[in-house]
From Swiss-Prot:
UniProt lineage: Bacteria, Bacillati, Bacillota, Bacilli, Lactobacillales
Membrane topology: Multi-pass membrane protein
Protein name: Lactose permease
Chain positions with Phosphohistidine modification: 545
Disulfide bonds: none
C-alpha cells in the first residue's frame, strides 16, 4: 500500500510540474516577449519572434508521431517512459530558462544572430518538452494492470495538474515584483522574470526526477508494438470517423476561444485595471474552484448527460464574458466575470475527453478496426495547433493595443483599450458560439449511443467467431462467479436467450468477484469493463458478461485486473463489480456466461440443477462431440 501511495504522489508531483511548465510556456512566455524582451517601440522584433514561435510550435506537431514512435521503441533498465520524462524534463527546463534571457544582450546588438539562437533553443525546448509530456501521460497504463489503481493514479494526477496550472497564476506577479530591481512596471523587469523562470525550471527538474525515482513501470508485452504512427494515419482516422472529426473542429474553436481570453487576462489586470495583483487573487480562487468543479463532473453528466452539460458550460462561459466585458474598472466585477468564465472549463474539457474516448468504439464499429492510440492522439494535436494560433493572436493584440515594453495602464490609449477589449471578449465569444453550433449539429455520440455501440461490437465479435473450430473433443466450464444458476432462456435479453452469442448459462450473483474459469488468454475486454472474452489453449472462446445494459454505466462500479492479451491462470481474479451500482441504476445484475463457438460441439448439458447455489469455480456446464 505504501509503495502505491508513493507512486501516486510521485506521479501527481510530475503532473504538477508538467502543468507549471506548460502554463509558463503557453501563457506567460508571450507576455515576457511582448513586454520585456526588447526596447520600447521595437514592434518589428516582437512580431518576428512571435511568428517564429508560432511556426516552430505548428511545425513541431509534424514531429509528434516520430516522438511517440521513439518512446515506443525505447528499452532501458529504467523502463520505456522514465528516461524521456526525466531527460526531457531537465533539458526542456534548462532551455526554457535560457529563453527568459536576452543571451547577453545580442537581442539588441546582433538581432539576426539572436533570432537564430532563439529559434534553435526554442526548438530544443519544444521537442524535449514534447518527449517529456508524451512519455509522462503515456505512463499510466504502465504503472499498473489494475484499472482501479489506474483511476486513482489519474485522479491524483488531475489534482496535481489543476494545482500546477493555477498556482503559476497565483505566484507569478508576487515573484516577479519581489525579484525585480524596478517596481515601476506592473509586470516587473527582466530580472524578476528571470528569477520566475528559474523557479519554474527548478520545479520542472525536481518533479521530473521525482517521477523517475518514485514510480515503477510494470513490464508487459501487451504494450510492445512495432506499429509506427504517422501524421497521415491520424488524419486518415479523422476522415473515417465523422464524430471524431466534428468534435475536433468544435474543440479547436472552443480552444481558440478560451486560450485567447485566458492568456489575455494578465494584460487585462495589468493594463486595463492597473492592478496586476488582482490576477494573483483570480488564480488563487481558480485553484480551489478548478478542483471542486471537476469533482462534480460524474454527477452532473449523469443527471443532464454530457451533451447538455456542454451546452450549459458554454452558456455560463458566455455569461462570464458578458459580465467581464462590462466590468470596466471594477476588480470585484472583473473577478465575478472571470470566475463565471472559468468554472465550466474543467467540465467542458472532461466532456470532450469522454466523447473522444467513446469515439474509439464508434470508429471501430464503422471501419471494422480499432484505432485507439490514433484516436486519442487527436486531442493533443488539436490542443497544440489551437495553442500556437491563440498565442499568435495574443501577441498581435498586445502589439495593436500598445501593451509592450515600457507600457503602463496610464499609457494605454482609449483606442488601445477598445481594441483590446474587442479582441479579448468578442473574439472568444464568437469562437465559443461556432464551437457549440458545430457540436449541436454534428456530434450525436451520447452515453446511450456509446452503450449501444459497445453491445453491437460484442455481438459482432461473437458472430464472427461463432464458427471458429475448437481443438478439443469436450469442454467443461466452471462458473466464474458465485450465485444461483439460471438457464440462458431465462435471461431478459433475446441476444443471450436465443443463444446468438453461444450456449452457456447465467447466474444471479452472490458477490462481485469474477474469476478465470480456466487458464488462457484475454481476447477481448470491454472498455466499460462489464464484459470479457477468454480463450483457452484449445481455442474455446468464453464470454463473461456482467449484467444487462451495464455498458451505460461506462465502467462505474467495475474493476479489471487484467487487460487484453493478458495470460490468466484458472482461479485468478480478473474482474470485480459493485452490485449496488448496477441496482441503483435500475439495471439487471444477471451474469451471463457463454461459449461463443459452442456450435462446433454436438452436445451440451448442465452439470448442476437450475436454481442450485454454486460457488465460483464449480463445474456447471459441459460441451462434447464435434459437429
Amino acid at each position: 500500500m505504501k509503495k502505491k501511495l508513493v507512486s501516486r504522489l510521485s506521479y501527481a508531483a510530475g503532473a504538477f510540474g508538467n502543468d507549471v511548465f506548460y502554463a509558463t510556456l503557453s501563457t506567460y512566455f508571450i507576455v515576457f516577449v511582448t513586454t520585456h524582451l526588447f526596447n520600447a517601440g521595437d514592434h518589428k522584433m516582437i512580431f518576428i519572434i512571435t511568428n517564429l514561435i508560432t511556426a516552430i510550435r505548428i511545425g513541431e506537431v509534424l514531429l509528434d508521431p516520430l516522438i511517440g514512435n521513439a518512446i515506443d521503441r525505447t528499452e532501458s533498465r529504467w523502463g520505456k517512459f522514465k528516461p524521456w520524462v526525466v531527460g526531457g524534463g531537465i533539458i526542456s527546463s534548462l532551455a526554457l530558462l535560457a529563453l527568459f534571457t536576452d543571451f547577453g544582450g545580442i537581442n539588441q546588438s546582433k538581432p539576426v544572430v539572436y533570432l537564430v539562437i532563439f529559434g534553435i533553443v526554442y526548438l530544443i525546448m519544444d521537442i524535449f518538452y514534447s518527449f517529456k509530456d508524451t512519455g509522462f501521460w503515456a505512463m499510466i497504463p504502465a504503472l499498473s494492470l489494475d484499472s482501479r489503481e489506474r483511476e486513482k493514479t489519474s485522479t491524483f494526477a488531475r489534482v496535481g495538474s489543476t494545482i500546477g496550472a493555477n498556482l503559476v497564476g497565483v505566484v507569478i506577479t508576487p515573484i516577479i515584483l519581489f525579484f525585480s530591481a524596478s517596481k515601476a512596471n506592473p509586470n516587473g523587469d527582466k530580472q524578476g522574470w528571470f528569477f520566475f523562470a528559474l523557479i519554474v525550471a527548478i520545479v520542472g527538474i525536481l518533479t521530473s526526477i521525482t517521477v523517475g525515482l518514485g514510480t515503477h513501470e510494470v513490464k508487459s508485452a501487451l504494450r510492445e508494438s512495432n506499429e509506427k504512427t504517422t501524421l497521415k494515419q491520424v488524419f486518415k482516422v479523422l476522415g473515417q470517423n465523422d464524430q471524431l472529426l466534428w468534435l475536433a473542429f468544435a474543440y479547436w474553436f472552443y480552444g481558440l476561444g478560451i486560450n485567447t481570453l485566458n492568456a489575455l487576462q494578465l494584460y487585462y489586470f495589468s493594463y486595463i485595471l492597473g492592478d496586476a495583483r488582482g490576477y494573483s487573487l483570480l488564480y488563487t480562487i481558480n485553484t480551489f474552484v478548478g478542483l471542486i468543479s471537476a469533482s462534480f463532473f460524474p454527477s452532473l453528466a449523469k443527471k443532464f448527460n454530457r451533451n447538455r452539460l456542454f451546452y450549459a458550460c458554454i452558456a455560463v462561459m458566455l455569461l462570464g464574458i458578458g459580465v467581464f466585458s462590462v466590468a470596466s474598472g471594477s476588480l470585484a466585477l472583473s473577478l465575478v466575470g472571470a470566475e463565471f468564465f472559468f468554472i465550466p472549463q474543467p467540465l467542458a474539457f472532461l466532456v470532450v475527453l469522454m466523447i473522444i474516448s467513446d469515439a474509439v468504439e464508434y470508429g471501430q464499429l464503422k471501419t471494422g478496426h480499432r484505432d485507439e492510440a490514433l484516436t486519442l492522439s487527436v486531442r493533443p494535436l488539436v490542443d497544440k495547433l489551437g495553442g500556437a494560433l491563440s498565442n499568435w493572436f495574443v501577441s498581435l493584440i498586445a502589439l495593436t493595443a500598445g501593451m509592450t515594453t515600457g507600457a503602463t495602464a496610464s499609457t494605454i490609449t482609449a483606442h488601445g483599450q477598445m481594441v483590446f477589449k474587442l479582441a479579448m471578449f468578442a473574439l472568444p465569444a464568437v469562437m465559443l458560439l461556432i464551437a457549440v453550433s458545430i457540436f449541436a449539429k454534428k456530434v450525436f455520440l451520447t452515453e446511450e449511443k456509446h452503450a449501444e455501440i459497445v453491445d453491437q461490437l460484442e455481438t459482432q465479435f461473437g458472430q464472427s467467431h461463432a464458427q471458429k473450430p475448437a481443438q478439443a473433443e469436450s469442454f467443461t466450464l466452471a462458473s466464474p462467479v458465485s450465485g444461483q444458476l439460471m438457464n440462458l432462456d431465462m435471461v431478459d435479453d433475446p441476444v443471450f436467450a436465443d443463444k446468438k452469442l453461444g450456449d452457456g448459462f447465467a447466474l444471479v450473483p452472490a458477490d462481485g468477484k469474477v474469476y478465470a474459469p480456466f487458464a488462457g488468454t484475454v481476447r477481448q475486454l470491454a472498455k466499460t469493463r462489464h464484459s470479457i472474452v477468454l480463450e483457452n489453449e484449445h481455442g474455446v472462446l468464453v464470454l463473461i458478461h456482467l449484467g444487462l445494459g451495464t455498458a451505460k454505466l461506462n465502467g462505474t462500479g467495475f474493476v479489471s485486473y487484467v487487460e487484453e492479451g493478458s495470460q490468466v491462470e484458472a482461479g485468478q481474479q480478473i474482474l470485480e463489480f459493485w452490485d449496488p451500482a448496477i441496482k441503483q441504476a435500475k439495471l439487471d445484475d444477471t451474469v451471463i456466461v457463454t461459449v461463443i463457438n459452442s456450435e462446433t460441439f454436438a452436445n451440451s448439458q448442465m452439470l448442476l440443477p437450475i436454481g442450485h447455489s454454486v460457488q465460483a469455480l464449480d463445474d456447471v456446464f459441459k460441451l462434447e462431440g464435434k459437429n
